[in-house]
UniProtKB/Swiss-Prot annotation:
Physiological role: Acts as a suppressor of RNA-mediated gene silencing, also known as post-transcriptional gene silencing (PTGS), a mechanism of plant viral defense that limits the accumulation of viral RNAs. Binds to dsRNAs without size specificity.
Protein name: RNA silencing suppressor p14
Domain of life, per lineage: Viruses
A GO molecular-function descriptor: RNA binding
Keywords: Host-virus interaction, Inhibition of host innate immune response by virus, RNA-binding, Suppressor of RNA silencing, Viral immunoevasion
GO BP of this protein: symbiont-mediated suppression of host innate immune response
Length: 130
């Protein structure tokens, strides 16, 4: 699952609009945040409605990519195409987290509503616990 060259987990790329979501694992200790993948360390922008930290940029292939950080695997929210997914569990649930993220961002209903729809992006939230 981990790409040793880029240090990202589970890239999720939409086949319609080429938007890619990368998952980064991070944890906080004593008021400091330690990032597992230092290549993407940046001052994150906070999404007010969800409190999610992320960074967007154009990748080397020219498609938009978004990096979203987890909170040590205890409570994680990912967001892409206007859909938010919250996963709660221990750090050993990372495999399940990646699987759920992949399933959600590649689900035909999500793709049709968010990528094919003519209206504004949805703000549906899906929550699961492990």
């Amino acid at each position: 699952m981990e790409n040793s060259q880029t240090g990202v987990l589970c890239p999720n790329r939409c086949q319609v609009c080429s938007h890619t979501t990368y998952i980064r694992e991070s944890s906080g200790q004593g008021g400091r945040q330690a990032c597992r993948f230092t290549r993407f360390v940046t001052q994150p922008r906070v999404v007010s409605e969800q409190g999610i930290q992320y960074r967007s940029w154009l990748s080397d292939r020219g498609f938009p990519a978004t990096l979203l950080s987890t909170s040590g695997g205890l409570s994680t929210t990912i967001r892409g195409h206007g859909v938010a997914v919250t996963i709660q569990g221990d750090s050993k649930s990372l495999l399940n987290f990646c699987r759920v993220a992949y399933d959600v961002f590649h689900h035909p209903v999500v793709q049709s509503e968010v990528c094919h729809g003519s209206g504004p992006a949805t703000s549906d939230e899906i929550t699961t616990k492990f």
